[in-house]
């Protein structure tokens, strides 16, 4: 199984890896789009990049980082991203076999494997990045069907834990998706928003470290239940699971 995670706006700076080597990244069919985005992103001066990226002057170093993407040090993608989901995942304690089950969606790289080395950058899935001839295409338009096509070549079950914005960059027909809901005092359900990433990080860790290999949504649910989680299979949408917290 391949567990597809969302990226994080917060990232670990620095790195000890060699500069970005696009041809070495997983899913090489995404290289051309990656190349064009890196070129357009690097062409923006920090002053111009701030409003495009939707960040304040306080985050100017993020915009500066985008100008040195080809020469900056790198680190494994799963360690580059930080924040709530990645804290719960605790990737630095995972075995190579567990890490091999993880991939990460992003606006800059489309999809990478956990061990792919990437630099520090700033770019979200909702950004409209100026391109050639004065156009400002959305990230969805830039990626088109390339992410979907690349993931169609994966011959194992995909568990898509990306947020809606990143799912829109490349939908995966047949993938297992997960909703996180909490039970209120009166017994009704509420979709979890604030801690959604935390619980998905916990689920990703459970799945990545499982000795079992899931091939169906039901088997994903069984693995999670075996770890003490409450998971339901939605009637009528067998690929959609609900994690109840």
Curated annotation (Swiss-Prot):
<dbReference type="InterPro" id="IPR005583">
    <property type="entry name" value="YaaA"/>
</dbReference>
<feature type="region of interest" description="Disordered">
    <location>
        <begin position="1"/>
        <end position="20"/>
    </location>
</feature>
<comment type="similarity">
    <text>Belongs to the UPF0246 family.</text>
</comment>
<dbReference type="GO" id="GO:0005829">
    <property type="term" value="C:cytosol"/>
</dbReference>
<protein>
    <recommendedName>
        <fullName>UPF0246 protein CE1889</fullName>
    </recommendedName>
</protein>
<dbReference type="Pfam" id="PF03883">
    <property type="entry name" value="H2O2_YaaD"/>
</dbReference>
<dbReference type="GO" id="GO:0033194">
    <property type="term" value="P:response to hydroperoxide"/>
</dbReference>
């Amino acid at each position: 199984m391949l567990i597809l995670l969302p990226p994080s706006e917060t990232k670990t700076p620095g790195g000890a890896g060699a500069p970005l080597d696009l041809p070495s990244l997983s899913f090489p069919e995404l290289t051309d789009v990656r190349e064009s985005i890196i070129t357009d992103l690097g062409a923006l001066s920090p002053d111009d990049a701030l409003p495009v990226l939707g960040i304040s002057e306080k985050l100017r170093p993020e915009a500066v980082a985008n100008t040195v993407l080809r020469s900056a040090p790198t680190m494994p993608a799963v360690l580059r991203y930080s924040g709530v989901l990645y804290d719960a995942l605790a990737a630095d304690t995972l075995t190579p076999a567990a890490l091999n089950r993880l991939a990460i969606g992003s606006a800059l790289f489309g999809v990478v494997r956990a061990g792919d080395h990437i630099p520090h950058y700033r770019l979200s899935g909702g950004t409209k990045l100026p391109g050639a001839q004065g156009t400002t295409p959305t990230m969805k338009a830039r990626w088109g069907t390339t992410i979907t096509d690349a993931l169609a070549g994966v011959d194992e079950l995909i568990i898509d834990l990306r947020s809606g914005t990143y799912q829109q960059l490349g939908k995966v027909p047949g993938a297992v998706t997960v909703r996180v809901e909490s039970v209120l005092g009166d017994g009704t359900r509420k979709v979890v928003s604030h801690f959604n990433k935390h619980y998905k990080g916990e689920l990703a860790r459970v799945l990545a470290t499982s000795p079992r290999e899931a091939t169906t949504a039901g088997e994903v649910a069984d693995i999670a239940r075996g770890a003490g989680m409450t998971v339901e299979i939605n009637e009528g949408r067998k690929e959609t699971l609900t994690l109840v917290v």
